[in-house]
Amino acid sequence: MEEVITIAQIVHRGTDILSLNNEEIEALVDEIYSTLKGSNDIKNIRLIDFLFTLKDFVNHVRAEQSKLPDLSMPMEAYIRQLLVDSDVVPIVSEKKKELRVRPSTRKEIFLINGTHLAVPAEAPIEIYGLKLRLKTFSPQCFMRMAEIGSFSPETLGYVASGANLTNFIRVFMKCVDQETWKKNGEGVVVTTKENIIQFTHQYIELYKFLRSGGHSWLINRLAEEMVHRKLDREDQGSHISNIVETEEIEPEENIKRVIFFLKELSTMYSVSPVFTSGYMPLLYDLYRAGYLEVLWNPVEQKFLQHAEQREKEQMILQQVDMKLMEVTTQARQYFKIMEEKIGRVQSDAIREILTMEGKVDDPNSILQEVIKACGKQEAELITTEYLNIKKQWELQEKNACAHLKLVKQLRSGLQYAESLKVLESIRVLYKEKNNTTNWNLCKACGFKLLCPHVDMLIQLQAAEASYDTMRTKLMKFSGINKEKENNQGLIYSYFCKICGEELAHFIQEDRTADVGVIGDLNSKLRIFIWQETMKACTFIHFGKLVDVKQFANIAVNVCLPLVYSIENIKKEEDYDPLTQLYAVIYIYAYILNLIYSSQKNKEFLTITIHGMKADSSLNAYVTFLLEKMMQQYSGIINQLSEITDQWIANNFREAFKKIIHQNGLQGLSVQDDTKVLLTEILLDPLYDYAATVARIDGSIPMYKPRTPKEAEYEFKTVIGRTPAELLSQKEFYDKIYTSKYRPDFTQLARLKDIYFQEESLRVWWGGRDEEKTSTLIYLRAYELFLKYLQNAPNFNSELAEFKTYENAYGEQKALLAQQGFYNIFDPNTGRADQRTRLFEYKRLPISTLYDERGLPHKWTIYVYKAVDSSQKPAEIEVTRKDVIKKIDDHYALADLRCSVCHVLQHEVGQLNIKKVQTALKASLEFNTFYAFYESRCPKGGLHDFQDKKCVKCGLFTYIIYDHLSQPELVHDYYNNYKDQYDKEKMSIRSIQIKKDMTTPSTETQPKPPQEPWTFDYGKIIKTAKILDISPAVIEAIGAMEGRSYADIREGQGAPPPPTSMDDPRLMAVDSAVRIFLYNYNCLRHVSTFNKPPMHVERLVKHLSYEEKEDLEKVLPNVVNEYHTTFKHLRVTDPASALLYSIEFLCISFLTLYEIKEPSWVVNIVREFALTELNTIIQSEKLLSKPGAFNFMIFGEDFVCSGEDSSMDDISAYSSPGLFGEDIIDRLDDPFSIEDVDISLDVLDNLAPQ
């Protein structure tokens, strides 16, 4: 008997084959091959094939990864696919300690590095003591061996990378045998390794060609004459020669090969179930671009048959699902009726029986148990009640009452004001008024209309009531209180006792004594503190596993009352930047207190900052937190002109004092590592998958474990070891957690998005280079982690190098983003243009869309021609549904025919375009005419239809919408009433014009002012002196665009005075004046606003309501005759109009700035005047030349280091000031606190005695 060598003898030879070098692998190959080369047994031949494939697999994993194109899906997405793959079904057998793989009935094709691999079912594979019996050996199976078996982490890393490489080669199953092609002129499907390599090269070239965007000619050739048209060598057909092979051949033969390639690719997708969930980006892109339409011929019969079969199966599944839903609903209702009519004792007994038998989710079993447990009368009672309920449901389904539309509109309203209006309409339909105990019934249909709690909820939301108020008032409807636990704690949900809808919920942290209520969604400040605390976790090092949500919840409970206790801070939904800054200060003070507390109790938990030693001084932590705060929240700080570094440091010190004295030393509860690890394992999808297989196999019971002993048995059966044995490596897991590389928060979020995202090719310009680079960063990080497990010192050095490249990549992205901002910056809108994709529009004659009667084409008739001239009939025309029945391999798709006008698709250019345009115009006129007389009658009033005809005007109902079936009737009716239609249309239009028209003015120009105006340059000088700027800057308002700020300050390069009333400078200055006056009037009449603008509210928030009312009396009216004078000068003397507007702006500023009494108004008005005028000037500076103004107004990130700004009077290195030239000559660190009295001794004395 001939010896058969098993896979176990090849793979499991006392060592891991993946750890061998190339020489050792080749020696192993020679040894096994010399034993098998004389064998005739088909099993040994397959093993030889497997051996060479395994060698290529290892070599590719080690050396070829960087050379292959990035066409593979991300590794995580590939692993996720394994969990849902149904081509092989693993069955775990505990008794025999082996994994049998039951093949499915569908066809299975798997590849490793492009080569088929079929392992006989009799050949067991032994990997690390685990015997496997496989029908087909595939990357999917190999990954399952790695995860379900006992592979080491190092081996798993190589396997994952190998599967990543082989994934994109799965599409190269079909290729063209060149020799057979030249002899027979057609392709032959082969699977030799050499052809696969050649086909791989062709595929990559085609992929690059499609991404280049120059492929529009290809579809024209394929869709028109295909292989019958001769192409010149100078034509773009030369591109395709580089795709098929290096030597130049006839273009029409190239097209034949491309057609063959596309056919084989689509056929492979149709007949192979592997590719239904595979990675086929090129085929998807070709299909989306419409290229596969040229392949709609008999070759696709298998595809159509599969599609039809899948559609039938889907319909059957839908019917089964509907039946299942119906039975499930019936079972639930039976239980509910039993509890209401008979009692819960009997229903609980039935539920317990079903749970013991594992049938609690089986609706048929529920129905049988309910009927069996009840007597005859009780069963009839339940059945009758259910039939009544079902009948009521059917009546409700058929109900067409008007209240249904109103209720739907109420529930889907986007604004509270709109919902309140709809609610008023609903209340009219209430059968009873002031009902708060039962459903409000509709007096029209008698069905349930609206629950009273919804009525009250809409009113409270429209009144902008707080969350606490809403919860208090809605609690009177609460009748059900359910409690459940999740990873955040205990959730208490309250439900309406009338309709069962959820009213409110809140979360109680069960892991600490502190209450963490994050349910108040209307409190923006509460959410702000929670979010900013979570962001701070990126630079805090806890040392042990800590619940960061608990950390944020405690921060909310500690900081929120302290922020609200500050004077002038109120509990309102809209909070200003000052309130946000106070919240940030208290958050960072809370973090400092945690660090201070951990230093006092080091045995429990050590909290520090990343990059700082745990025993660092408290002064060092204070310096870091202050710098971090000023850098992270510079946008908020820059909005507050009165805030200084000293102010922030002083308030930070006071906040730290309050937190220490009110909360004392604080600590966080450390999570139980054992509990966390076991929870993660039990919730892992792979564990659930393996447990399900074990239940099917009978290794563990079908029901969930009910005792600790059963739970431990299940865990050991699935994992292979007990929890105690698994947790014995706790120190190893701690070491991984504390030492392995973890990206920062933003980078991690970015990588996760790419990590779980399916990559897809794009045929438009741009591609996916950024995602490719980010994916490589992730894979490199994963590879470094595997190396860490082997050699930690080398890992640390490689990690430092990797992080250097990662940071450089981030800086490169930032520079590219800034460059793109300036390249596509739109000065009209003040922001970057969002239109980044390029589209190319193709001009087509209108006859390609419409025929000569103005009707759109419908290409629903397929024209097939015989491939052989001797075939009869030579041409067949069929519809799409008849293709399978009437078309065979002897016919090919030649053209399409329109079912409306019966013209062929390639003949649309021969249609008369003028006729098409005339018909479209007439069709539009007919549509407008008959829409106008759809209900109104030209004889007066409405139509009086009898027997589908108006007895007054003779209009038939069927020609209102159909203008083609009876063209004579359509034209006759149109000609009879065309004049009447024109008169009525003009009459309606004239009435509308009269409504919109106003009485024309008899004056030819604006009325002159009562007092003549003379220019006073002293007002401009006085204003410039207060603002500490050059008078020329004020004169340049409206004329700074395109000028450097140095020229503006010196008064150089100013444009000539305006000579036209439409000069844009007049509109710019007039707009500035109007904005100043509008904001001033908002300040004067602030008492009339329910919600004044934020900048106005900030100025008057300390005033009482009576004082706000008095502002209108004590503040002067500065408008006077501005509008009259400006309109007059704009028409008569545009140059004077410009000077007048600038002078009026200065006069208004001086009038407010020089107010002396009453004293409580002086500071408000002065601050308003300074802020408004500085804002106008700052806005004008934005229009000056780039680099000529202070980019610090955008924040520190916009300042480019290294740029010479010595020629500009505003340095790009300076920090923004309050007034003047925005220059503060400060060369030291702007975040320095060297002049702030915060020392270690002072902070140490802050602790409670």
UniProtKB/Swiss-Prot annotation:
Annotated keywords: Host cytoplasm, Host-virus interaction, Inhibition of host innate immune response by virus, Inhibition of host IRF3 by virus, Inhibition of host RLR pathway by virus, Late protein, Viral immunoevasion, Virion
Coiled-coil stretches: none
Chief localization: virion
Domain of life from the UniProt record: Viruses
Subcellular location: Virion; Host cytoplasm
Induction: Expressed in the late phase of the viral replicative cycle.
One annotated Gene Ontology cellular component of this protein: host cell cytoplasm
GO biological process, one term: symbiont-mediated suppression of host cytoplasmic pattern recognition receptor signaling pathway via inhibition of IRF3 activity
Function: Together with the penton and the other minor capsid proteins (p17, p49), forms a complicated network immediately below the outer capsid shell, stabilizing the whole capsid. In addition, blocks IFN-beta transactivation mediated by the cGAS-STING pathway and regulates the transcriptional activity of IFN-beta. Mechanistically, suppresses the phosphorylation of host key adapter protein TBK1 and degrades host IRF3 in the cytoplasm.
Record note on quaternary structure: Interacts with the minor capsid protein p17 and with the hexon capsid protein p72 capsomers; these interactions form a rigid zipper structure that stabilizes the capsomers. Interacts with host IRF3.
Family statement drawn from the similarity comment of this UniProt entry: Belongs to the asfivirus M1249L family.
Name recorded for this polypeptide: Minor capsid protein M1249L
Species of origin: African swine fever virus (isolate Tick/South Africa/Pretoriuskop Pr4/1996) (ASFV)
